[in-house]
Amino acid sequence: LRTRRCAQGSSGSACRVCKLRNKCLGIHRFKPIGSYPVAVFKLIRRVAIVLVILYASLFALTKVIHYPEPIAAIRLGLAPASKTPDLMPFHYIVAAPSTFAPWKNGNSESVQNVKYDGKRITFDDFLKATSTNAFMIIRDGKITYESYLNGKSQSTILPSYSVAKTMTSLVIGQLIDEGKIKESDAFVSILPEFKAGTSFDKVTIKDLLDMNSGIGVSDNYPSGPSGWGVAIAQVYASTDVNWWLMHNRKMREEPGTFPEYRSVNTQMLGLIIQKITGRSLSDEFTDRIWQPVGAEHDATWNVDHKGGFEKAFCCFNATARDYARVGQALMSGTPKIASKAWKTRLSTPAVKLDYGWGYSAQMWHPYPGINLMLGLHGQYIYQDVA
């Protein structure tokens, strides 16, 4: 037996360790298990039981709302942007060695000092201050500047976030050119299982392309855990995007009347592609875009579950050089990944969104003569077409 001074320490009080109720001398005798009293182990056991019940409850909840299991969901929510592609299942977009087109180097150009946060700093310091992982300049089809930071390299797969929206639009544009769909087609005419009996049924492909559907799923939500319960954050982590859309068809405005940037629109375009072609968005993108531009590396597109649907609004991942190949092909017309008509559609602002910037068919227009593919965490494919 060992002795331990009473935590209560007063005569006549109930002792929490030995539960004496008559007279407490301030000293207890107890039989230790290892080096801890029985009460400590009881407390640990109770806490463990509570945690197991809590985890089981959360696990059951994630199954009901089609979310990853709790630990996976927390890892995804807290991960830095560059790590998220590996935390969700994905489909491969396969590069073809036979179509690989090596980059040529042009005359090297230096980037001058820039104004950032009210100060003039070197461009290298700017890249570091903005946590940039890769930066390239392509001029006249040749690389004139290329820099990698934070341990990244030419072969590093980087997430695009909403740059993926324009990638999805390129496939939609080809389907329109082929006469397989029209911009005037209603979404539910292609996927009738989503009919809601409301103005949702009037939403057209054009509405989706120009962020003008009126579907009430906002992209405005708090960062961090406080925003995880918001609808658009839910679809990012969802293990069943069809289930998610079925439960998020509420309309905020009439279609075509109130343009606002909402990622749900692009997700619906992705579902259209899979329904019309009978193939995954990844497979269509491989054949229509990736191999024709001569991509060097395989890319990935995150999906809701293995063999499921791509998250068309966000989750395309590739190397910096291969992103640049898509941008260069779209600008030069070689290889042809967009018809003249679709390039005009992409380049002609249809509505005004945030900051008064123009927007059309999943492409931003911040200034005249500029086409911009823009991702949430500072991903850009910036085209000066003037």
Where are these regions (language model features)?
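N-terminal leader/targeting segments and the immediately adjacent pre-domain N-terminus
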Residues: 33-153, 181
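Active-site helix/loop module of the DD-peptidase/beta-lactamase fold
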Residues: 159, 177-216, 220, 250, ...
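Flexible glycine/proline-enriched surface loops and loop-helix/loop-strand junctions
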Residues: 153-154, 249-255, 265-267, 305-312
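Active-site SXXK
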Residues: 141, 158-184, 208, 269-273, ...
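Conserved active-site loop region of the serine DD-peptidase/beta-lactamase
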Residues: 279-297, 309, 313-383
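Cysteine-centered motifs
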Residues: 6, 15-18, 24
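Amphipathic alpha-helical interface segments
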Residues: 225-236, 247
